Amino acid sequence: MKKILITSLLSVSLFVICLFLAWKSLSATNFFFERLYQLHAIDEQIKKYAPQNRNKENFELTQSSEHQRIFGEIVSSINSNGRGLAEISYFNSFGDKIDEFLTNDEITHLEDVSELIVYSTQIVLSLTGVLIAVYGFFFYYKVSRSRYFWKPVTTLFSFSTMVFTLILITGFVFVIGARKVFHILHELLFADKGQWFFYYQDSLMTTLLPESLFGSIAVMITVCALIYWVILNIIISKILE
């Protein structure tokens, strides 16, 4: 029972770190937004809702390359303590500025997201330090005493358990409803923060970044994190065997 508890805690902690690594890696690629843009038919969404926007005009006249650039700037800003959010603007095909992209409420929300990333970074760095110390102790114990304080389970068993856990979580999301889970998470993470829900008619941000897009991004992050987790598990197992 003790070994199962230790193994579970270590696996979950390592996966949390891998989720952060996945976020950073995919941020560097802008989450392959050019592919997601096509998958979610965001151009059609912009054509439908941008003309209805009550705050900003003529976004429907912009090109897909402009939409992808704006997404990249948003990702860059929220990974940089929110710097530059207010300056994000959209331009017509001649390079003339039309307007700033974000409203004040949207900027506040994205700054809240940025603060969450900073807080998450601090947690992950602390967790990484703890895991290095724990695994270092296990290695030292094995080398100095020629026996195990804790021996890792096989990579196949560990992988199977993690995949099973992720399948259960996925099933839970489908039962509750992806949209409802999305809203619950926002209510928990941004309680007592600025506005986080925006109607299409009031927000170019929501028009460009519909809720369904974040579902795809969540899947990408999870798959990427699982790959990192498997690689790190193999390395750790080789060291501690």
Task: List the predicted regions and their residue ranges.
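Juxtamembrane interface at the cytosolic side of transmembrane helices
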Residues: M1-V12, L127-F182, V230-E241
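Hydrophobic secretory-pathway targeting helix
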Residues: M1-F33
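Terminal transmembrane helical module of multi-pass membrane proteins
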Residues: K193-E241
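Juxtamembrane non-transmembrane "cap" segments at the membrane-aqueous interface
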Residues: V175-Y200
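Alpha-helical membrane-embedding segments
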Residues: S65-S80, E187-L188, D192, G215-I231
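Long, solvent-exposed extracytoplasmic domains/loops
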Residues: F33-V113
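Short, aromatic-rich amphipathic segments at membrane interfaces
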Residues: F101-T121, D202-G215
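Alpha-helical membrane-inserting segments
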Residues: C18, A22, L26, I169, ...
